[in-house]
Amino acid sequence: PYAEHFIFISWPKKFWGYDALQSKGGFPSGLKDWMQKKSYLHGKISIRLASNKNTNNKKSDIFIYPGNHIYRDVYPNKIIEILDLHFQKNFKQSNYYKKYNNEQIFICTHGRHDKCCAKYGQKVAEVMRQHLEKEDLNIEVWESSHLGGHRFAPTLIDFPNGYSYGRLSSDNIPIFFENRKKNKIFAPAYRGKVFLSEFEQIAEAHLQQYCYSKGLRCNLEIKKIKKISEKKFMCIAKFYPDEFFEKYQKYFAEESTFDFILKEFKNPSGCDSTNENKIRECWELQN
């Protein structure tokens, strides 16, 4: 998923519809149109719903990234008004506004959109909460409406960094948090940073996974993307030295060029239709 602004609005999951922004329980109408119109003015905006055991439909919390902004206890009929104020840079005038320092992980469990999200996401959310409680870690876990890419379920976004992950198994949750504590990406499940463009995310995720396969921890930056054709692009990535830089030099120059091609494959179209194969396309790292 890519956006310049991610907005999560707390709303009980029992009211979510297939299209989250057309949910029930008194959820305000017009947010989908608002999102599309404001995206033209402010860059792409992505609005998702979020739920936990304390969520109700009387008042909502609104979380906005980047920037760690939160609006607490907002009445449903005030949500669009508050969002307008935020994007007018008048957010500090709002009595609802607070600067927020808590770390949050949003996991897609949106079963009404695709059963895979509920089947895999729910378990990971529960195991993750248990692990955090056991380790006494102050990180919030929220269940989210559809984040995109249900074939990668369970999908999640880790904020404030905006790292997205897919196919994270329950067994890998301890090592995921061990890496996180060291400010390391968990490369096997990494899908890219959501604030980067589509091609930058693809390149970054593939290179992190490639480094992992070589036993390396990559500290890299995508410096340039060039689209060659509809089915090919290249990137230039810069690798920054750390204590393992001599090992890097076996595989990379300080700045290296990589090619990606788009390939077709077949897999089930979703957990709703496991017997129906669908032709999909996926980018692959060539060199």
Feature names for model-found ranges:
Residues 1-287:
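Histidine/cysteine-enriched polar flanking segments
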